[in-house]
Amino acid sequence: MKIAELLDTSTLKDLDISGLAEHSGMVKPGYGFLAVSDKLWDREKHIDQAVERGATVVLVDDSITVPPTASVPWVRVRNLSTRRGELAAKFYGDPSRTLNCVGVTGTNGKTSIAIHVADMTQLMGSTSAYIGTLGWGPLGQLQDLGMTTPNAVMIQKSLARMRAGGTDTVA
């Protein structure tokens, strides 16, 4: 996807990105990196790591000053931290629009309830999957997320992969 299409801007009209990441360790060559850390030192360290891993563009909040020596383009995005999910959904084809998504909140038992919901909907004929602390994917085939709470980009990417694999319900 062209970065200009993702951001609805004329900036960098010809720059394609092949993925998005907001965790520098998950950047692959050709990705756009969403630098959303509110701590300057962390943000700079993560940007450096993302660029080393092949990020072709860095998205930062519009309050951030772009350094004149940046080795890849930086794009300032208004309210980036609150728009992460929106941008990731757009990039990955808005997967939740065509999935039945069941969210579970609370203090205790979220993982257990989500697993039970995925299991029950599977028994009722849905092609169900889970996303959360234990990973993502169909039950019995969960893939590790690398962290207990997936970020907005990871959620959208995982939902898109599950949808492409035939899943219709995600808990």
Show which residues each predicted segment covers.
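N-terminal leader/targeting and accessory segments in enzymes
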Residues: 1-86, 90
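Phosphate-binding loop of NTP-binding sites
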Residues: 84-171
